[in-house]
Regions:
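Sec-dependent N-terminal signal peptides
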Residues: 23-32
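Ligand-binding "clamshell"
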Residues: 67, 121-135, 179
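Extracytoplasmic small-molecule ligand-binding "clamshell" domains
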Residues: 40-116, 124
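Flexible hinge/capping segments at coil-to-helix
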Residues: 143-160
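Positively charged n-region of N-terminal signal peptides that target proteins for export
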Residues: 17-23
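Ligand-binding cleft/hinge of the Venus flytrap
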Residues: 63-69, 80-89, 151-156, 169-180
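Residues embedded in well-ordered beta-strands
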Residues: 52, 138-140
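Sec/Tat signal peptide C-region and signal peptidase I cleavage site
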Residues: 19, 32-38
């Protein structure tokens, strides 16, 4: 990587992190439907001095748990550390699973989570900020099978096994697009 590429990457990364911190701080204040409750949630975080963040630790490069150190690392982890620093509190990463990521918020197991896909079902019970990272989901097949599986419809076959992570929005989409 050239110096210019490194600078551009760091500049973009810092701008994105700053934008995300603002969005997430706003989410902490407005996470619950009633502003008084949301404000008390923020007050609770500030008075306890701890921001509890639910994270799965299984989605590189956003959140990964390093088995050597047993600590989390990744883009979302960096942003949450910066957000906590800006708030003047410590951050505590709480292990979470995709299938229960939203219930961890609604049960107050943690205060916030990141990189959670907004779905209508999740939006019924949880608040979401604006998107800070967009990605697409596409089927992945072995290169030698590209001709055999050249369309999405060619994958919708009872003899084809589709694998996803349980509890994710990708699981929902796989069931929708590949019902066979």
């Amino acid at each position: 990587m050239t110096l210019r590429q490194d600078y551009s990457h760091n500049l973009f990364s810092n701008q994105l992190k700053n934008r995300m911190k603002k969005l997430l701080l706003a989410a902490l204040v407005a996470f619950l439907p009633f502003s008084a409750i949301a404000e008390s949630n923020l007050d609770k975080i500030l008075s306890a001095g701890i921001l509890k963040v639910g994270t799965t630790g299984d989605w590189d490069p956003m959140t990964m748990k390093d088995p050597a150190t047993n600590k989390y690392k990744g883009f979302d982890i960096d942003v949450m550390n910066e957000l906590a620093k800006d708030m003047g509190v410590k951050v505590e990463f709480v292990p979470a699973e995709w299938k229960t990521i939203v219930s961890g918020i609604t049960s107050a197991r943690y205060d916030i989570s990141t990189s959670v896909t907004k779905t209508p079902k999740r939006a019924e019970v949880a608040g979401f900020t604006d998107t800070y990272y967009k990605y697409g989901t596409v089927p992945l097949v072995l290169k030698k099978n590209l001709k055999k599986f050249s369309t999405w419809n060619s994958l919708n076959n009872s003899k084809v096994t589709i694998a996803t992570t349980l509890g994710t929005s990708q699981e929902e989409k796989a069931k929708e697009f590949f019902p066979k």
